[in-house]
UniProtKB/Swiss-Prot annotation:
The chain crosses the membrane at residues 38-58, 95-115, 134-154, 199-219, 220-240. It is found in: Plastid, Chloroplast thylakoid membrane. One of its GO terms (molecular function) is proton-transporting ATP synthase activity, rotational mechanism. Its main location: plastid. The keyword Metal-binding does not apply. Keywords: ATP synthesis, CF(0), Chloroplast, Hydrogen ion transport, Ion transport, Membrane, Plastid, Thylakoid, Transmembrane, Transmembrane helix, Transport. CDD domains: ATP-synt_Fo_a_6. Pfam families: ATP-synt_A. Belongs to the ATPase A chain family. The gene is atpI. This is ATP synthase subunit a, chloroplastic. F-type ATPases have 2 components, CF(1) - the catalytic core - and CF(0) - the membrane proton channel. CF(1) has five subunits: alpha(3), beta(3), gamma(1), delta(1), epsilon(1). CF(0) has four main subunits: a, b, b' and c. It is a multi-pass membrane protein. InterPro entries: ATP_syn_F0_a_bact/chloroplast, ATP_synth_F0_asu, ATP_synth_F0_asu_AS, F0_ATP_A_sf.
Amino acid sequence: MNVLSYSINTLKGLYEISGVEVGQHFYWKIGGFQVHAQVLITSWVVIVILLGSAIVTVRNPQTIPTDGQNFFEYILEFIRDVSKTQIGEEYGPWVPFIGTLFLFIFVSNWSGALLPWKIIELPHGELAAPTNDINTTVALALLTSIAYFYAGLSKKGLGYFGKYIQPTPILLPINILEDFTKPLSLSFRLFGNILADELVVVVLVSLVPSVVPIPVMFLGLFTSGIQALIFATLAAAYIGESMEGHH
């Protein structure tokens, strides 16, 4: 009976897990539009965390930096290094964009593991990390696409489109397809990794004692940071590529 009872409880847990699906959403109706409330709520929380921590830490810069100021200066230096390595000497104007991408994705990813989203109940679906939703990752990828098109056009003008027939016009369809696959790969890589990480933790918490999933959660924090770095690095690389014209 104990085995049967355990099996039934396990099946119930799996059934509850199956409710965590990509298609469950909670919407706000504003005028004639449906607004994806889950993503907006969690994104606002992440933005408030970023702005609040930055304002509190660096509103009064000190000649002898405080620990918080040192931390933010280190982050800025890190983002500048990534931008300069991928874009080149003209990296300066792109540091805010690359930094915004990196910090938003990084904090969003970590919020999925560290913030107790589940305690806030919604009529439909549940709150999770913003990057756990395909709408967020696609939006970030499209912003990156707009950025590297803008970078190429602002530097080369209409001559930028000449890259599509290099080194031979035969490669025109492939070169066009490449620009369409870049945002797809960026968005689905980030979305898939974050969604899979959260689902693995949910499954383990449901099936085994609470202490066992802790190492997996720490691994998830590490991979979440890596995913933010990969996204920002690739975005900078695409911008640098569009300005230089090399594939």
